[in-house]
Amino acid sequence: MEEIQRYLQLERSQQHDFLYPLILQEYIYAFAHDRGFGRSILSEKSGYDNKSSLLIVKRLITRMYQQNHFLISPNDSNQNPFWARNNNLYSQIISEGFAFIVEIPFSLQLISCLEGKKIVKSQNLRSIHSIFPFLEDNFSHLNFVLDILIPHPVHVEILVQTLRYWVKDAASLHLLRFFLNEYCKWNSLITPKKASSSFSKRNQRLFLFLYNSHVCEYEAIFVFLRNQSSHLRSTSSGVLLERIYFYGKIERLVNVFVKVKDFQANLWLVKEPCMHYIRYQRKSILASKGTSLFMNKWKCYLVTFWQWHFSLWFHPRRIYINQLSNHSLEFLGYLSSVRMNPSVVRSQILENSFLINNAIKKFDTLVPIIPLIASLAKVKFCNVLGHPISKPVRADLSDSNIIDRFGRICRNLSHYHSGSSNKKSLYRIKYILRLSCARTLARKHKSTVRAFLKRLGSELLEEFLMSEEDVLFLTFPKVSSTLRGVYRSRIWYLDIVAINDLANHK
């Protein structure tokens, strides 16, 4: 972002938040390419240079506006595959530029916010594991959780309208609206049943940005309610009767206050101090210390408000209210729950002694072994029952290369699931990968696993079999027994910014 700020001069267009001139700037697409969008379809298929030139971008935009879709039928894409390939080419290149440009105002705002709050290591806040220490500190004191699967918007126009509040450039929004509508139309001619899924896969960065900006709009209701609930907790009921405008705003938002006499009865809905909200991708969680009736009211109020103002249709089967004490929450590749940890304390007063039974709530995180085995079976590391199988590999791959690939997968899973309370499930996953690697090598050499290991020795798999704990104590040979005990407990890392593909059970 510092490089972008050097290129972005304070011109008159940028002072008014105009982003359309940036679409025709050469360095924008160079930055977009360098940021890891991957090689474009143009550079892969047609042999052009990796960097999208300004002339190519201008031609693509002109062709979009001049394209006559009434002369195109689904049979044309079958007879002329070059047309379908060009369609994906247009969307890929333009979406890369769009995704990079629309992120600029948000990135600049984030940088100024972090500098104002003097947050140095902001990358630690992006870690997925940073959510779990928050859950450990707060969820053990809560009772019920509202599990919500957020639906996608019914139309792409809703995404553009949401972005309009942040980007004040009508020309950029018009081009974005035209691109989204025309691309969906093109794709529906080729693959009618997979238009939206194909769009999200080929233009993942742009789609995620538009979707997250839309979700953040209706998540702002929690900020409003939190601020007002903080005010309500420090305000007497006599003063509240005079705040007609405030109650009118609350009534419009959540339909709580219907009559003046209902103020005292319904005030507790927005006074609840222990309401916590977290979200990752399409799954959001709302946890509270209140009762089941309290959570049902929140469900009705919030869902009604979101559907009315943001055109989101929440299916009743996608919203669950569960009690934390007897329900496991599947979130970010973990099964999280709050369980009672019984403990017995012996107390003695003079000659009399007695036992005191204490039950302490403890936040527990486990590795979901069944979905994880299903993910391994999907990529042919084992069968559906969890029995390791060999993977077909190319004959030109060396043994060390095969071991390195298996070992990297094992270390990544161990790294991501290091916060598990029980390591037994994780050890089983390591066993599956270890034996699958051995069977793959034996299959390559046309031998059995036992004969292969006996002939080459177990030192061949030494690097693969080494666990993270062994690596830790090889790095720090004088480690104490206290640190060894700490390692066996849960560890959350602050360098994980994406969920592991195998841990993402979909």
Swiss-Prot record:
One Pfam family, short name: MatK_N
GO molecular function term, any single one: RNA binding
Record localization: Plastid, Chloroplast
Biological processes, Gene Ontology terms: mRNA processing; RNA splicing; tRNA processing
Domain of life: Eukaryota
GO CC entries: chloroplast
Keywords: Chloroplast, mRNA processing, Plastid, RNA-binding, tRNA processing
InterPro entries reported in the protein's UniProt record: Domain_X, Maturase_MatK, Maturase_MatK_N
Function summary: Usually encoded in the trnK tRNA gene intron. Probably assists in splicing its own and other chloroplast group II introns.
UniProt family annotation: Belongs to the intron maturase 2 family. MatK subfamily.
The protein, known as: Maturase K
Organism lineage: Eukaryota, Viridiplantae, Streptophyta, Embryophyta, Tracheophyta
